[in-house]
From Swiss-Prot:
It is an enzyme of class 2 (transferase). This is Shaggy-related protein kinase epsilon. It catalyses: L-seryl-[protein] + ATP = O-phospho-L-seryl-[protein] + ADP + H(+); L-threonyl-[protein] + ATP = O-phospho-L-threonyl-[protein] + ADP + H(+). Autophosphorylated mainly on threonine and serine residues. May mediate extracellular signals to regulate transcription in differentiating cells. Its EC number is 2.7.11.1. Belongs to the protein kinase superfamily. CMGC Ser/Thr protein kinase family. GSK-3 subfamily. SUPFAM superfamilies: Protein kinase-like (PK-like).
Length: 410
């Protein structure tokens, strides 16, 4: 069994003199930990009152393939997220000085954790990476899973709010960068791994405010969708829910993420949500006010059980009238391709990436507003490009970036 434990901050003073200790406390319920070893994961963890601000969590990882086990110590710093799932807190690795995010979720002992299984499949520059994980228990014998993730300081939600509060529009270069990277993450999880995220929203899109690299996070709702197998329809946050989910469809596809991405793009252009419904029905009303009443054929594509339902007949509102007149027409066109009633008519994530709206990102002379280089956009892996036509590849990877994809014979 790996050795685990906690130490008071004072006993590690020499290691963490530069660590900032925040006044904010973590919930007391997770401060009474017992040892829990997970044989399958070969990563153990936490003993004692380890997650109170300023306390040290000591865990042992590794030991696979004859490698020596390694002790890692984390100092809990502050809560960065809270929800029905549990909490996310920021911590500092005392050996390396690296800041991490630790997501702590209640684990049903009868099941494997789907989020953990999903995270282990993922390796992509636009997806938050899992460093390692450990289990812990409270005195009530509740089991918690702790996912140690890379820390990214901002979210697209907060960046967008910053501009809207200042009564400004987000610079279009950022809209392009964020949307491109969202679509690239989706192309990878949909095509490369077969996973549907099911909760795409600005709060789940992390962004580095210096490089503007975006990383998709929170795979707590993610699932590998299997054709013919039903799924729950009450999934995804309301403003970003695809209409087939509102109609109660259970055999939906990864195109629900595409709808959500379209909602995010529209929100970045508008400075506010496009479909701000107060309830499920109200959400549908907001969508109909923009897209018009769905045709019988479109309803059939979303949920065949509703084809006889009588909807108020409303004409579609022209897309160009929804956005500010200075909004690039390519942006409006892309929104219209992502927000289609019929799931099979929505652009795929890969089709979205090659849309002309993103041509500026493929120009070797394009820079961030501060003059810095753009974040990595073309470092594709073979897994991302499987099945892509030569025509698509030629649009996807500009000449100046071909060296990054040396495995392609372009």
């Amino acid at each position: 069994m790996a050795s685990v434990g906690t130490l008071p901050a004072s006993s590690m003073a020499t290691k963490q003199s530069n660590a900032s200790i925040c006044a904010e406390k973590l919930p007391e319920g997770i401060n009474e930990m017992k040892i829990k070893d997970d044989k399958e994961m070969e990563a153990a963890v936490v003993d004692g009152n380890g997650t109170e601000t300023g306390h040290i969590i000591v865990t042992t990882i590794g030991g696979k393939n004859g490698q020596p086990k390694q002790t890692i110590s984390y100092m809990a710093e502050r809560i960065v997220g809270q929800g029905s799932f549990g909490i996310v807190f920021q911590a500092k690795c005392l050996e390396t000085g690296e800041t991490v995010a630790i997501k702590k979720v209640l684990q049903d002992k009868r099941y494997k954790n789907r989020e953990l299984q999903t995270m282990r499949l993922l390796d992509h520059p636009n997806v938050v990476s899992l460093k390692h994980c450990f289990f812990s228990t409270t005195e009530k014998d509740e089991l918690y899973l702790n996912l140690v993730l890379e820390y990214v300081p901002e979210t697209v939600y907060r960046v967008s709010k910053h501009y809207s509060r200042a009564n400004q529009r987000m610079p279009i270069i950022y809209v392009k960068l964020y949307t491109y990277q969202i679509c690239r993450a989706l192309a990878y999880i949909h095509g490369g791994v077969g996973v549907c995220h099911r909760d795409i929203k600005p709060q789940n899109l992390l962004v580095n405010p210096h490089t503007h690299q975006v990383k998709l996070c929170d795979f707590g709702s993610a699932k590998v969708l299997v054709k013919g197998e039903p799924n729950i329809s009450y999934i995804c946050s309301r403003y970003y829910r695809a209409p087939e989910l509102i109609f109660g469809a259970t055999e939906y596809t990864t195109t629900i993420d595409i709808w959500s991405a379209g909602c995010v793009l529209a929100e970045l252009l508008l400075g506010q949500p496009l479909f701000p419904g107060e309830s499920g029905v109200d959400q549908l009303v907001e969508i109909i006010k923009v897209l018009g009443t769905p045709t019988r054929e479109e309803i059939k594509c979303m949920n065949p059980n509703y084809t006889e339902f009588k909807f108020p007949q409303i004409k579609a509102h022209p897309w160009h009238k929804i956005f500010h007149k200075r909004t690039p027409p390519e942006a409006v066109d892309l929104v219209s391709r992502l927000l289609q009633y019929s799931p099979n008519l929505r652009s795929t994530a890969m089709e979205a990436i090659v849309h002309p709206f993103f041509d500026e990102l493929r120009d070797p002379n394009t820079r961030l507003p501060n003059g810095r280089a753009l974040p990595p956009l073309f470092n594709f892996k073979p897994q991302e490009l499987k099945g892509a036509s030569l025509e698509l590849l030629s649009k996807l990877i500009p000449d100046h970036a071909r060296k990054q994809c040396s495995f392609l014979a372009l």
